[in-house]
């Protein structure tokens, strides 16, 4: 809800001459923003929006049936929240699907492992020896052809931080690791889940393969399973079987959903905020980005409840296909 004061100030403010090189927000606008902020902090609209989306729709992978239901849900929610105008814009994109995935250690220490395919990974079955690397840089430094027919495993352990700053390293492994593995001749790619948790649900996200490379199966191991694989690798060579039934399947069309509070004096000038409506398919997407949908819809709703409409138009967009786009 902390977006509300800034939105209101932007929609109500006037600027001084260019020579003064500064913008002054009128006291009346600041007072209204402060009042609105207190209302927002005491209001549960955002919470109810997130609860509704995650309960009634749940996971909503771009291009899926649930994604289509989410679009209809968002249109209805904007209207219920009192937005003046509600409309949709079509968005067409390649459609990636996850059907099944599994992995297992073979041989004397045979046991199952819990994985999830990375978004954009092709399907396939790989049975090969695992070669462990502590970091992405170590994999990138491996000589060309040195992992011919093997599975590259990047076992980078993210560090917990209040600002989540180490996530950029985890996401870099997801984004760049499969292509780095391909350059070494690897037949498959595994990474330790990008997170600092201890449950057996692996983190997913989009990966991309560099132009000119033939994609290989790529997956994320849960942190407990990555620990287990690392311990086994310390004992000696480990052979693993990874089977993914995933891949691109034509095109799909989803929609951006837009709700608008019309400005009273300068409706053609628009203050735009937004969040993405789609999520990955393994959870309800409450944080990524259900919370953003709740915050932005609620902000627009509360501004729309003011006795005086904002000077400029407030436009809230629930964007399609952010996760894979």
Predicted segments — roles?
Residues 21-31, 35, 51, 55-163:
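Noncatalytic luminal/extracellular "stalk/propeptide" segments of secretory-pathway proteins
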Residues 29-32, 45-50, 57, 66-74, ...:
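Stable alpha-helical elements in mature extracytoplasmic
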Residues 30-32, 106-144, 207-286, 298-301, ...:
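Soluble metallo-hydrolase cores and metallopeptidase-like ectodomains found primarily
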Residues 49-54, 87-88, 130-132, 151-155, ...:
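Structural recognition of the beta-strand scaffold that forms the well-ordered cores
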Residues 157-159, 195-196, 277-279, 317-324:
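Acidic, glycine-rich active-site loops and adjacent beta-strand->loop/helix elements
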């Amino acid at each position: 809800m902390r977006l509300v004061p800034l939105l209101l100030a932007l929609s109500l403010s006037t600027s001084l001459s260019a020579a003064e090189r500064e913008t002054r927000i009128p006291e009346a606008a600041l007072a209204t923003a402060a009042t609105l902020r207190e209302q927002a902090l005491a209001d549960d609209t955002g919470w109810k929006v997130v609860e509704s989306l995650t309960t009634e729709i749940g996971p909503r992978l771009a291009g899926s049936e649930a994604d289509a239901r989410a679009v209809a849900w968002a249109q209805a929610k904007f209207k219920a929240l009192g937005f003046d105008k509600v409309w949709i814009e079509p968005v067409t994109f390649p459609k990636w699907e996850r059907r099944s995935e599994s992995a297992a250690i073979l041989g004397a220490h045979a046991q199952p492992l819990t994985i999830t395919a990375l978004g954009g990974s092709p399907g396939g079955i790989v049975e090969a020896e695992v070669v462990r690397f502590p970091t992405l840089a170590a994999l990138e430094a491996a000589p060309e052809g040195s992992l011919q027919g093997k599975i590259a495993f990047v076992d980078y352990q993210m560090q917990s931080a209040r600002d989540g700053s180490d996530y950029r390293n985890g996401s870099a492994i997801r984004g760049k690791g499969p292509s780095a593995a391909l350059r070494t001749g690897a037949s498959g790619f595994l990474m330790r889940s990008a997170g600092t948790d201890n449950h057996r649900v692996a983190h997913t996200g989009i990966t991309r393969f560099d132009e000119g490379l033939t994609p290989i199966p790529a997956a994320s191991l849960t942190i407990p399973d990555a620990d287990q694989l690392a311990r086994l690798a310390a004992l000696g060579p480990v052979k693993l079987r990874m089977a993914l039934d995933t891949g691109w399947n034509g095109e799909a069309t989803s929609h951006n959903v837009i709700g608008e509070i019309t400005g009273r004096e300068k409706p053609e000038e628009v203050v735009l905020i937004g969040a993405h409506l789609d999520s990955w398919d393994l959870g309800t997407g409450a944080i990524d980005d259900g919370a953003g949908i709740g915050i932005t819809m609620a902000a627009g709703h509360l501004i729309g409840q003011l006795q005086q409409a904002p000077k400029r138009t407030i436009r809230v967009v629930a964007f399609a296909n952010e996760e894979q786009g």
